[in-house]
Curated annotation (Swiss-Prot):
This is Poly(A) RNA polymerase, mitochondrial. It is linked to Spastic ataxia 4, autosomal recessive: A slowly progressive neurodegenerative disease characterized by cerebellar ataxia, spastic paraparesis, dysarthria, and optic atrophy. Keywords: Acetylation, ATP-binding, Cytoplasm, Disease variant, Magnesium, Manganese, Metal-binding, Mitochondrion, mRNA processing, Neurodegeneration, Nucleotide-binding, Nucleotidyltransferase, RNA-binding, Transcription, Transferase, Transit peptide. Changing residue 378 to A: Reduced enzyme activity. Homodimer. Belongs to the DNA polymerase type-B-like family. Its EC number is 2.7.7.19. Ubiquitous, with stronger expression in tissues with high energy requirements: heart, brain, and skeletal muscle. It comes from Homo sapiens. It is found in: Cytoplasm; Mitochondrion. It is an enzyme of class 2 (transferase). ATP binds at residues 107-109, 241-242. One of its GO terms (molecular function) is manganese ion binding. The keyword Signal does not apply.
Length: 582
């Protein structure tokens, strides 16, 4: 989907580099005394430094450790719908009677909400015991005990102050482009884009809390189950405003029921059986969908999409503002998230390049939120990883090389698919490649603008081009389910559009090397120029490139042809366009 309002750049004078910095919105975490919230204010990070500005965003720890820590944190957290005007100090004082508070923040989504993390899980029980079910004269409330509360004031007029809330959405396009035009270099632009689009600490906490609230409901049917987030919410490539993908993990329930042999007796649970795992999945999701629809506070627009290849329940969690997709036992997707988490943590340039390529694709409608023949963000991410594996020296290791570093603890086979790779980041040697982001962005467009898509596939497991196993226009091998093509949906016309835009973008960046605008110029430059809609002069560039290619083709044909038909052929051959290959 194209960036809304991106066309405003053709009319607004946004790119004059200001002497005064653009004012950034306040984004903060409110912490109780003694709590350090060092990594939560985006505006305190230097906009041009990947090394110091973003390294602490990707901790050098295992994915499983991060997941467990976040989940435990979410279990000690409550979500409270608050009045618009509320005294923050009185609010905290009231909640502190139930137990010490670790930290909290406010945000807005169909009202004002507070996310409050207690130091101990037992404090939530105390708060629930002091809470009552609302009653109205006209309607009957369905009693449901959860960690989602509604706070009312007995005296509305006594509170006059407003709390400052954290930002859960990216900046407007105008603000973003002003920041990008102010940057000192293209590298600085890519880093700024990353900082503005990446998930904040607050947003990440809210995502895990939402999963934890859904888990509470699912646990009524399946004790010891876990609702795990996966995809962009956890792989460090998520953008503010992205959907929340989650799956119901029943493996813990199965593990608890593992056979425990005691003498001659073997005890089993009485269960119901169904013909296949797919039918079991459909029945489980059907029940959970009904539960969310009828009893889930804040869950609206529930859709049970049970006949899809991967059955799911889709709903909006109104309180958090997230569009959610719930599946079951999707462990391969979680493993893919872990792999991307590792790649994003290995080199600070990876995420900056991925975010910029995705933004570029969205600005030119190469990607869309609507399913169809478009390239997906996941496919673009795989293409960036593959490109970085192909650099000399490589910036990222291949999946096969990560597999060779794995030990017995890392061994993982899911549904017959080998998903083994090293999980310990400290065992992976950092790259010796020192190329700039500006060079990598330009080389990315040149590489895929000239890639032999008609013959070769993209394979991050081996990090090299391979012959395509079928005739799909774009073939990107699934890293774990290796017989699948993750880009099978992409049409030839969409691929050709990608190639044409990649070539054009490479040319624009090449021109930046020789014709970079002065500080006083108001002309869009660098990354901003790549996000502009095609202008007449840029269309003429594409046409000139096409004509040049056609002229060279005709010239070669003329040399091999004889007779009076040569002249007539010359007049009609100029319409030929650039093919996918060069």
């Amino acid at each position: 989907m194209a960036v809304p309002g991106v066309g405003l750049l053709t009319r607004l004078n946004l790119c004059a580099r200001r002497r005064t910095r653009v004012q950034r919105p306040i984004v903060r975490l409110l912490s109780c005394p003694g709590t350090v919230a060092k990594d939560l204010r985006r505006d305190e990070q230097p906009s041009g430094s990947v090394e110091t500005g973003f390294e602490d965003k990707i901790p050098k720890r295992r994915f499983s450790e991060m997941q467990n820590e976040r989940r435990e944190q979410a279990q000690r957290t409550v979500l409270i719908h608050c009045p618009e005007k509320i005294s923050e100090n009185k609010f905290l004082k009231y909640l502190s009677q139930f137990g010490p508070i670790n930290n909290h923040f406010f945000y807005e989504s169909f009202g004002l909400y507070a996310v409050v993390e207690f130091c101990q899980k037992e404090s939530i029980g105390s708060l629930q015991n002091g809470t009552h079910t609302p009653s109205t004269a006209m309607e009957t409330a369905i009693p449901f005990r959860s960690r989602f509360f509604n706070l009312k004031l007995k005296n509305q007029t006594s509170e006059r102050s407003r709390v400052r809330s954290s930002n859960q959405l990216p900046r407007s396009n105008k603000q973003l482009f002003e920041l990008l035009c102010y940057a000192e270099s293209i590298d600085d632009q890519l880093n700024t884009l990353l900082k503005e689009f990446q998930l904040t600490e607050e947003n990440t906490k809210l995502r895990y809390l939402t999963c934890s609230l859904i888990e509470d409901m699912a646990a009524a049917y399946f004790p010891d189950c876990i609702v795990r987030p996966f995809g962009s919410s956890v792989n460090t490539f998520g953008k503010l405003g992205c959907d929340l993908d989650m799956f119901l993990d029943l493996d813990e329930t199965r593990n608890l029921s593992a056979h425990k042999i005691s003498g001659n007796f073997l005890m089993e649970f009485q269960v119901k059986n169904v013909p296949s795992e797919r039918i079991a999945t459909q029945k489980i999701l059907s029940v959970l969908g009904e539960c969310l629809d009828h009893f889930g506070p804040g869950c609206v627009g529930v859709q049970k999409i049970l006949n899809a290849r991967c059955p799911l329940v889709r709903f909006s969690h109104q309180a958090s503002g997230f569009q959610c997709d719930l599946t079951t036992n999707n462990r391969i997707a979680l493993t893919s998230s872990e792999l991307l988490y590792i790649y994003g943590a290995l080199d600070s340039r990876v995420r900056a390049l991925v975010f910029s390529v995705r933004c570029w694709a969205r600005a030119h409608s190469l990607t869309s939120s609507i399913p169809g023949a478009w390239i997906t963000n996941f496919s673009l991410t795989m293409m960036v990883i593959f490109f970085l594996q192909r650099r000399s020296p490589p910036i990222l290791p291949t999946l096969d090389s990560l597999k060779t570093l794995a030990d017995a603890e890392d061994k993982c086979v899911i549904e017959g698919n080998n998903c083994t790779f090293v999980r310990d980041l400290s065992r992976i040697k950092p790259s010796q490649n020192t190329e700039t982001l500006e060079l990598l962005l330009k080389e990315f467009f040149e590489y895929f603008g000239n890639f032999a898509f008609d013959k070769n596939s993209i394979n991050i497991r081996q990090g090299r081009e391979q012959n395509k196993p079928d005739s799909s226009p774009l073939y990107i091998q699934n890293p774990f389910e290796t017989s699948l093509n993750i880009s099978k949906n992409v049409s030839q016309s969409q691929l050709q559009k990608f190639v044409d835009l990649a070539r054009e973008s490479a040319w624009i960046l090449q021109q930046e090397d020789t014709d970079r605008p002065s500080i006083s110029s108001n002309r869009p430059w660098g990354l901003v120029s790549l996000l502009l809609p095609s202008a007449p002069n840029r269309k003429s560039f594409t046409k000139k490139k096409s004509n040049k290619f056609a002229i060279e083709t005709v010239k070669n044909l003329l040399e091999s042809l004889k007779g009076n038909r040569t002249e007539n052929f010359t007049k009609t051959s100029g319409k030929r366009t650039i093919s996918t290959q060069t």
